[in-house]
A protein has these predicted regions:
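S-adenosylmethionine
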Residues: 1-263
Length: 263
């Protein structure tokens, strides 16, 4: 859940989880919306979407809809639409070998480059759906540089409007490795999570922001910075939303009691 906790989402935003099944990250993002805004959860696998649907329903995320589509088709309908996008990309799964021996059994030397090709296409489509000023978080559960630092280095070269954003770290977090890609020092802003450094599996995470345009001057950079520094904490706005909902619920209950008493 590190990926979902690092993406700063607030009520009223449009959020896309592009590779969402089975739904743990999607439901975490939906909870941050507090019933306001929109969550779009997509997965290309029809069988995995069933698990995604179940988890969305169980968690009661009302402002959401599910898709079972390739990213390119979604991008045709949602150009520059989303405030926040999460891409937990399909990968070679090297970080899961300890947890899932089957992942180690099916691994081959050809898998990382094959996955990297697919990841580039997914990321390209995700960037096209991201609003100027919006944020995208990319993650994998593999150690392979081809799928991690080299993907982000490619993004920085091919999409100059994208820039890496540093994330708040925890014990066990390690910096990205520029030496495993093109040497760009910006790659240190990525995060590697090693299973022998903390309790968990191997992961890679990178948070990026799309350059703003003059039309977006009403959204202050300070707001983005505040979100980043407190990505896993509830804001005062969240508390206000909960208080308003609680007050409205109490009002409806009182009205119902009066109707019973005098009706």
């Amino acid at each position: 859940m590190t990926t979902a906790s690092r993406l700063p989402v607030g009520p009223g935003e449009r959020v896309l989880d592009l590779c969402a099944a089975p739904g743990g990250k999607a439901t975490a993002l939906g909870a941050k919306l507090f019933g306001e805004g929109l969550l779009v959860a997509n997965d290309i696998s029809a069988s995995r979407v069933k698990a995604l649907l179940k988890n969305i329903e169980v968690m009661g995320i009302p402002n959401s809809f599910l898709l079972n589509e390739v990213p390119a088709k979604i991008a045709e309908q949602f150009p520059a639409y989303f405030d926040k996008i999460l891409v937990d990309a399909p990968c070679s799964g090297e970080g899961m070998f300890r947890k899932n021996p089957e992942a180690a059994r099916v691994w081959s030397e050809e898998k990382p480059p094959e996955c990297a090709k697919m990841q580039k296409e997914i990321v390209k489509q995700a960037i096209s759906m991201l609003k100027p000023g919006g944020m995208m978080i990319y993650s994998t559960c593999t150690f392979s540089p081809e799928e991690n630092e080299q993907i982000i280095a490619w993004v920085l070269r091919e999409f100059p409007e994208m820039q890496l954003i540093p994330m708040k770290g925890y014990e066990g977090f390690s910096e990205g490795r520029p030496d495993l890609a093109d040497g760009n020092p910006e790659l240190k802003k990525c995060v590697r999570i090693w299973p022998h450094h903390m309790d968990g599996e191997g992961h890679f995470v990178a948070l990026m922001q799309k350059s703003r345009t003059p039309e977006m001057d009403d959204v202050s950079p300070e707001k983005s910075s505040a979100y980043i520094s407190e990505a896993d904490e509830e804001s005062s706005d969240h508390d206000d939303v909960k208080k308003k909902k609680k007050k409205a619920k109490k009002g409806r209950k009182d009205q119902k009691e009066r109707n019973i008493q005098f009706g």
